[in-house]
Curated annotation (Swiss-Prot):
Keywords: Auxin signaling pathway, Nucleus, Repressor, Transcription, Transcription regulation. Belongs to the Aux/IAA family. Its main location: nucleus. The lineage of its organism: Eukaryota, Viridiplantae, Streptophyta, Embryophyta, Tracheophyta. Residues 58-67 have a biased composition (Low complexity). This is Auxin-induced protein 22E. The gene is AUX22E. Residues 15-77 are annotated as: Disordered.
Length: 203
């Protein structure tokens, strides 16, 4: 029997995995990534399974960390688009109007015009605390004089008379309402001639 196997040379024609020219068959590795230790003792199946799991977990964690790092390095920074989200025009206008009304408490500037003057001036109404202070400032600003104001006659007899436009769009004489009410309702000022002031207030 031995001579028959030798004659046929079955060992030479045997199929096996391995590099060409190597006579020893390659040992079957228990799992990828595990280190084969030369030992006469055979390890238990539970120990081999735990080693395989630990190697797989370490490989997967390394690959996950690498992929996360690559994603962080490649991902561009998010830039907020200007004008997004869109706001309706009426809502935008109301928001801007609220900001203007709230303001920063610095001042309340009003336009002042004078009959015959080709220019306008601006004054801060919050600077003044009473009518006399305001009238004095207007006289110095436009180099004019006002007569004394009375509830019955207004500025009767003076060359010029200061008037203001209220919230309703009506033109009234400066001094016909209490100061606080005037400050809250005044939109702009205009100095007119005394003759043109008839029909306003008491004139």
């Amino acid at each position: 029997m031995g001579s028959y196997e030798t004659e046929l040379n079955l060992r030479a024609t045997e199929l096996r995995l391995g590099l060409p020219g190597s006579d020893e068959p390659q040992e079957k590795r228990p799992c990828s990534g595990s280190v084969v230790r030369s030992s006469n003792k055979r390890s238990s199946p539970e120990l081999e399974e735990s080693r395989c799991k630990s190697n797989i977990n370490s490989d997967s964690s390394d690959s996950t960390t690498t992929s996360d790092h690559n994603e962080d390095s490649v991902q561009p920074a998010k830039v907020q688009v200007v004008g997004w989200p869109p706001i309706r025009s009426f809502r935008k206008n109301s928001l801007q109007q609220k900001k203007v009304e709230q303001g920063d408490g610095t001042g309340m500037y009003l336009k002042v015009s004078m009959a015959g003057a080709p220019y306008l001036r601006k004054i801060d109404l919050k600077v003044y605390k009473s009518y006399p202070e305001l009238l004095k400032a207007l006289q110095n600003l436009f180099k004019c004089t006002f007569g004394e104001y009375s509830e019955r006659e207004g500025y009767n007899g003076s060359e010029y008379a200061p008037t203001y436009e209220d919230k309703d769009g009506d033109w009234m004489l400066v001094g016909d309402v209490p100061w606080n009410m005037f400050v809250s309702s005044c939109k702009r000022l205009r100095i007119i001639k005394g003759s043109e002031a008839k029909g306003l207030g008491c004139l």
